Regions:
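Conserved active-site and cofactor/substrate-binding residues in soluble primary-metabolism enzymes
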Residues: 46-49, 53, 75-79, 106, ...
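Alpha/beta enzyme core
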Residues: 2-4, 23, 29, 45-64, ...
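Generic beta-strand/beta-sheet core signal
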Residues: 69-71, 100, 127, 166-168, ...
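A mid-to-C-terminal "edge-of-domain" accessory segment
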Residues: 2-35, 283-413
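Short, small-residue-enriched loops and turns at beta-alpha junctions
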Residues: 36, 40-41, 72-75, 131-134, ...
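Catalytic alpha/beta core domains of metabolic enzymes, predominantly
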Residues: 199-202, 206-337, 345
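N-terminal capping/small domains of soluble enzymes
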Residues: 1-103, 360, 364, 370, ...
Length: 413
């Protein structure tokens, strides 16, 4: 059999059938780890020197924007904002800063001061609840929300800040109210609007309908240049699907956090967004430092990485199953690295500096053992293979390196 073209080996159903995704040429990323990520009730807020490391790792991954805090929350957040902006200035970093603020002058003023002190442009992300349920709970009238929004945007622009207008709980807001609020925000000077699934309540169809509707609204009011952001949460476990649908529908920037940490059960994991956009050819970032980034965030926030976490979990590229391992080994024997990295993996491990790992356990076959021994420089014999297989079949779990090497040392044919 001749060597086939790689793209002929994997059939892509996204290109066939009645529903064909329409992906943009590029989409930007906004990393919320240092703001929304730190709103998780279980995280530890890391020291500033670690936040600076995190910022540099974001840039190494090609992330365009970092949310550097919520200065209205207190002095610690205001000081972190200044230090992060100074780091951007001193190192001439490409990553841009934005900052969350309520539609209150007391929240916006520290952002303007940070820009003035550091010379770093900061996008003010001015948020206010737009849904009827929030307005009822707060006893707000729509006119109050509208007035606060206009005043805040006008003040921020006067202070020299670019503005993104953020409607909290957008997915549960009515078109009539959104039309009024978004039109007023754009007329006041907002350069972007952010649509939020603040409570993780939406399903993909709702997200597609919302983002498409907002895109049409912006065209209708003569402002197609205004960018659309998408900010999702994972309460229903639909965060990544919703983010991808938002991109398809026209969002030009999407938000995420390392490991998906954030308010309640968290946000869309940015490592998953990065990999999926690369798989689709929308972005082509160097992701070899992605594990380092996620591991650092995990370590300093004290949020453990689940072993089965996509892409960055310990088990992401491990197998001890005989059928799976045999296929990977056959691909290696063909000298076909591309094939070996995809035959039983939807994500190429090599993209993030990892490799497919074959282990030995109760579901293994002889090929697992033979591959393991050969890769550890141990002569492969039928007798040793059988001995290790016998032990593996009796074990309730995958054998450790120490256990396998102990069998090897104690083996006498």
């Amino acid at each position: 059999m001749g060597i086939p073209e790689e793209n002929s080996l994997v059939y892509d159903w996204t290109e066939q059938g009645p529903r064909r995704a329409r992906w943009p040429g590029h989409v930007m990323l906004d990393d919320e780890t240092l703001r929304d990520g730190l709103q998780s009730p279980s995280v530890t807020d890391p020291p500033i020197d670690t936040k600076l490391q995190i910022l540099h790792l974001m840039e190494s991954l090609g992330i365009e924007t970092a949310d550097v805090g919520l200065p209205g929350a207190g002095e610690r957040q205001r000081e972190a904002l200044l230090q992060l902006c100074r780091e951007i200035a001193q190192h001439h970093m490409r990553i841009r800063a934005n900052c969350a603020a309520r539609t209150l002058m007391v929240d916006i003023r520290p952002i303007a001061e940070a820009t003035q002190l550091t010379g770093v442009p900061i996008e003010a992300c001015l948020f206010i609840g737009s849904s009827p349920i929030r307005q009822y709970a707060e006893e707000w009238e729509l006119d109050d929300v509208l007035r606060h929004s206009r005043e805040a945007i006008t003040f921020a622009l006067r202070e020299g800040l670019e503005v993104m207008y953020v409607t909290e709980d957008t997915v549960r807001s009515s078109p009539d109210q959104l039309r009024i609020l978004l039109k007023a925000a754009v007329e006041a000077g907002a350069k972007r609007v952010c649509l939020c699934d603040t409570c993780g309540a939406a399903a993909p169809d709702a997200v597609y309908n919302l983002v498409t509707w907002v895109g049409a609204l912006l065209c209708e009011i003569g402002s197609p240049q205004v960018g659309i952001d998408w900010h999702g949460h994972r309460d229903r476990g639909l965060d990544l699907a919703n983010t991808m649908v938002a991109i398809e529908a026209g969002a030009s920037r999407v938000h995420g956090t390392a490991l998906g940490i954030g308010e309640r059960v968290g946000n869309t994991p940015i490592e998953q967004i990065l990999v999926n956009l690369k798989l689709l050819g929308i972005r082509n970032d160097d992701l070899t430092r992605l594990p380092e980034y996620v591991q650092l965030v995990s370590q300093v926030t004290r949020v453990p990485i689940p072993v089965n976490a996509p892409i960055v979990g310990h088990d992401a590229f491990r197998t001890a199953t005989g059928v799976h391992a045999a296929a990977v080994i056959k691909a290696h024997k063909k000298g076909h690295t591309w094939l070996a990295d995809r035959i039983y993996s939807g994500v190429p491990a090599g993209w993030i500096g990892r490799s497919q790992k074959i282990e030995i356990g109760p579901m293994s076959g002889n090929s697992n053992v033979q591959h393991y021994l050969a890769s550890h420089g141990v002569p492969v014999t039928p007798e040793l293979t059988k001995r290790i297989m016998d032990e593996a079949k009796k074990s309730p779990r995958v054998l450790t390196d120490g256990e396998i090497l102990e069998i090897v040392r104690g083996f006498s044919p």
